[in-house]
Each structure stands twice: as structure tokens, then as C-alpha cells.
């Protein structure tokens, strides 16, 4: 948390615990960072520990250690097959992934997320049609709207107890999604988070939490199983 505070102060903000809005701000282009350098893979980084812009011809990429933020639209494509990215490793220093960062990366199959990731922005991985199952870190607090929309090959999702919010339609149209597990009590769920997940069979929730989950996700009440 101390390193995160220092990063925020470097961006001109002073905060105790960053909010969802703070993380969105970190990832935005409101602060037009000066490009500090381009790495050997052709990826641009700022002088404020942000990955600014990626090379869409890369097939595999490891985000550099020390990076705090993957900026909005960093690897986003304007057409589904414009990106060649197949696998992605997010350094454990990264705390936030911005809006549309990897959206429509149609060949992307494998991602390893930072163990310290807190925020995933809206549409971050939407339309990554070939993305396979992956693990969310125990640090994660915010998953933005449509963040994994139309990730057709996901079959199982396990959400950490740290999670505070899932935005609307975050996992909508994940056609092969069958099993979801919540390790803790999710305070807020947007509308339609599993909309059009026609193969969803069961949502595992903690014992004693059924009333809460029916309240925040009433349309899925027949799928809840306490354990």
C-alpha cells in the first residue's frame, strides 16, 4: 500500500486508500505522461510507471517489473484480428488495468495476472474470444462493466474474498461458463453480470450468505449453492 500511495502522489493525488474512481483515473489519459522509453519489444512506458502503448504485432509479452498501471487502450484493437497477442504475463507490481486495455485481442489465450492487482477496468478483456481459464489474485477489489464480455472459452470463475464490486455485464455472453465460486460476501453486483451465460449451472457462495446474494443477484437465485 505504501508503494501505491507513492505512485498516486507521483500522479499529483494524495489519498489514504484509493477508490475505484482513483484507479480509473490512474489508468486514464487525463495526465498526459511523457514517454520515458520504449522497451526492446516496442512497448512504450511513461516516467510515472505506466505502460502507455503496446505493439499489436507481439505474440507474447511480459509487462515490466515496476510498472504500476496498464493504461486504458494500451493493447486495444480497432478490429478483432488486428492483434497477434497469444499470451500475457502481468508483473506483480501492477495494481490497475485500464479500460479497453486488451479488448478484442482475439488470439489471446493465456493470461497471468499480477498477485497485487486491485482494479480491472471496463471492457479490459472484452471480446477475447479464445481466452482460457485463469486465476484472479486475492488482492482484487474491482471488476469493471463488460470487462470479460464475450470471452467464449471461459468455463469456470473463482472470485476472491477481497472482491468489492463486479460491474454490469462483466461476464455476459461467456457462452461456455458453467461454474462460478464466490469465496466471500460480494458487496455489490451490477445488472446482468452473467447475462446470456446459457451454460451456467451453479454459483457457489459461502454458507449463510444466500439471502444476501439473492438480494444483489436475484435473477440467479436458482443457481446458488451454499458451501
Predicted regions and their residues:
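Consensus positions within tandem repeat domains that build extended binding/scaffold surfaces
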Residues: 51-52, 73-74, 98-101, 121-124, ...
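Short regulatory "switch" loops immediately downstream of catalytic or recognition motifs
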Residues: 75-79
Amino acid at each position: 500500500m505504501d508503494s501505491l500511495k507513492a505512485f498516486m502522489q507521483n500522479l499529483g493525488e494524495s489519498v489514504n486508500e484509493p477508490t475505484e474512481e482513483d484507479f480509473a483515473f490512474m489508468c486514464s489519459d487525463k495526465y498526459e505522461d511523457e514517454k520515458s522509453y520504449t522497451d526492446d519489444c516496442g512497448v512504450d512506458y511513461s516516467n510515472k510507471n505506466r505502460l502507455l502503448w503496446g505493439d499489436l504485432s507481439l505474440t507474447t509479452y511480459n509487462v515490466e517489473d515496476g510498472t504500476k498501471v496498464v493504461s486504458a487502450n494500451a493493447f486495444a484493437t480497432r478490429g478483432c484480428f488486428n492483434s497477434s497477442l497469444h499470451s500475457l504475463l502481468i508483473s506483480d507490481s501492477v495494481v490497475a488495468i485500464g479500460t479497453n486495455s486488451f479488448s478484442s485481442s482475439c488470439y489471446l489465450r493465456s493470461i497471468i495476472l499480477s498477485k497485487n492487482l486491485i482494479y480491472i477496468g471496463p471492457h479490459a478483456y472484452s471480446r477475447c474470444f479464445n481466452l482460457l481459464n485463469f486465476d484472479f489474485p486475492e488482492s482484487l477489489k474491482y471488476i469493471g462493466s463488460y470487462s470479460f464480455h464475450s470471452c467464449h472459452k471461459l468455463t469456470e470463475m473463482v472470485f476472491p474474498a477481497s472482491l468489492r464490486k463486479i460491474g454490469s455485464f462483466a461476464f455476459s455472453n461467456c457462452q461456455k461458463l458453467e461454474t462460478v465460486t464466490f469465496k466471500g460476501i460480494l458487496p455489490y453486483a451490477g445488472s446482468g453480470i452473467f447475462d446470456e451465460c446459457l451454460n451456467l449451472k451453479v454459483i457457489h457462495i459461502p454458507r449463510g450468505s444466500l439471502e444476501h446474494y439473492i438480494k444483489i443477484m436475484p435473477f440467479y437465485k436458482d443457481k446458488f449453492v451454499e458451501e
